[in-house]
Design a protein with these regions (language model features):
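Class II aminoacyl-tRNA synthetase catalytic cores and aaRS-like
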Residues: 1-367
């Protein structure tokens, strides 16, 4: 079915309109929905492509683990590189850029074979393209640590690096910053390393589910608690969790299906209980009156007894984009809109006449 949403355009997202295969299942669990998604993706991709497709069950990755290992909640599992936390390894370091910072490390197998230009280019990418303050690196050779921050790699530090998987012949990249920033930049550096070193597995579709999303997040700008992902999902632990737990520790029954670094579907076990709904929104700063006013259709429907239900919505356009090996949705849409959300072929949106407005009882009042 077509879905209309006010979203900014990008390579994997069409402005204004897209198609979803939307389904809801009564008296269903999260796992049952994931099994349906597995069947949809495996059968469709096997039928219409000749690439290798992951067999069910797909990997289930908790959101926290995804952010720690990949720096993103839609990881491309064709890329074998993993982000490691190296904060404790450098706790006694004399390197000022690492002091009092979260330090993320990426071990690149056989990376010591790369020349200085490669490391300079990666540093330039990190600083100019993704906003890093810098990108530290070192090679582990037979002669010992070489290049970059080699002089700060003590025997104790080297031992710590070996514990996270580094060995002679490898190179390492380090990002030091505040926790969330370091995590995000490390994720982008990981992706770029995979591309530049040609590490991405070819002719294969690697699927996974991201699960256990946080129900809430802290909004630093407004100093308040906000919903993290989907406000209408069921919190894990129900009312007891909402009443007794730190909101930032509450997880939700929310899940995303991911393939090759793209979000393919999003879904949740829905919150069908009006009391739970009011309490969940209260934590995010909404009064019961606001919930009734802004979400009246749901709130009022729930009063009549809605069955427990769960669902998801795979994106049809995005599935087609991957199955045709394109990297932009415009290539698989018959009449794509431009970046200003205009349909150039039809000349839409366009001005309407007074008669047309009168027919639908709309009046334009100019200020």
């Amino acid at each position: 079915a077509p879905c209309f949403r006010d979203e900014d355009p990008r390579a994997d997202r069409a402005p204004g309109e897209f198609y979803q295969l939307d389904f809801e299942m009564a008296f269903s669990t999260q796992e049952e929905v994931l099994e349906v998604l597995e069947e949809i993706f495996t059968s469709t991709f096997k039928e219409f492509t000749n690439w290798k497709v992951d067999e069910a069950p797909f990997l289930r990755i908790p959101y926290k683990e995804a952010m720690e290992k990949y720096g993103i909640d839609k990881p491309d599992l064709r890329n074998p590189l993993i982000i490691q936390d190296a904060t404790s390894i450098f706790k006694e370091t004399e390197f000022n850029a690492f002091k009092d910072k979260t330090i993320k490390a990426i071990v690149v197998p056989n990376g010591a074979n790369e020349g200085r230009k490669f490391f300079d280019n990666m540093t330039e990418f990190a600083v100019n393209e993704v906003g890093a303050k810098g990108l530290a690196w070192v090679k582990l050779t037979e002669e010992g640590p070489v290049g970059g921050i080699a002089k700060f790699i003590t025997e104790e530090v080297k031992k710590g690096l070996e514990e996270i998987g580094a060995k002679t012949g490898d190179s390492l990249f380090f990002i030091a910053d505040e926790f969330k920033t370091a995590q995000k930049i490390a994720g982008l550096v990981r992706i770029e390393l995979g591309k530049r070193l040609d590490l991405i597995e070819k002719d294969t579709y690697r699927f996974c589910f991201i699960v256990d999303f946080p129900m809430y997040e802290y909004n630093e700008e407004e100093d308040k608690i906000d919903f993290n992902h989907n406000p209408f999902s069921m919190p894990q632990g129900g009312m007891k969790a909402l009443e007794e737990m730190n909101p930032l520790d509450i997880l939700a029954y929310q899940y995303d299906a991911v393939c090759n670094g793209y979000e393919m579907a999003s879904g949740a076990v829905r919150n069908h209980n009006p009391e739970l709904m009011v309490k969940a929104f209260e934590i995010a700063g909404y009064s019961e009156k606001e919930v009734e006013t802004r979400f009246g259709a749901l709130y009022n429907a729930f009063q009549y007894g809605t069955p427990p239900h769960a669902g998801a919505a795979p994106g049809v356009d995005r599935m087609l984009m991957l199955m045709t090996n394109e990297d932009n949705l415009r290539e698989i849409i018959a009449f794509p809109k431009n970046k200003k959300a205009r349909d150039v072929l039809m000349g839409a949106p366009s001005r309407v006449t007074e008669e047309q407005l009168k027919d639908v009882q709309i009046k334009i009042i100019e200020e």
